[in-house]
Amino acid sequence: MQEINADNVLEVRNYLLDLQNNIIAMVCKYDNNKFIKDEWVRDEGGGGVTGILQSGDIFDKVGVNFSDISGKHLPAAATNLRTELQGRSYQAMGVSVVCHPKNPHVPTVHLNVRLFIAYSENSPPIWWFGGGFDMTPY
């Protein structure tokens, strides 16, 4: 696996912020209502930007959210099957989207893409991309 460095992480972060803005712009192209954006900070580390559209012409509600959070320890549930992650700090960043259309014949859409990095002082970071996409009947 290729090693990851601070420049790579910043490049992914900027890409994800652009992705959030591009998705919001695309939704606004078809729905006349405005997104309300709210920046937030996480006490344990990191933060993000929540983007919400409500009561639009096409969509009942859309959320397009960016987060970049960090922490000192991974929970046991995350390390039980991956012992190489035990004792590592972490950083996770991503974009998640949920679209609830007004049309009952159009499915609800959920998607997310994320970068996860587990850091150790004594060895290179362990990192991977994850995500998913699903459509649920209204």
Residue ranges and their predicted role:
Residues 50-128:
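Internal mixed beta-strand/loop scaffold within catalytic domains of large alpha/beta enzymes
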Residues 130-132:
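Long amphipathic alpha-helical segments with strong coiled-coil/leucine-zipper propensity
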Residues 4-83:
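Gly/Pro-rich turn-and-neighbor structural signature
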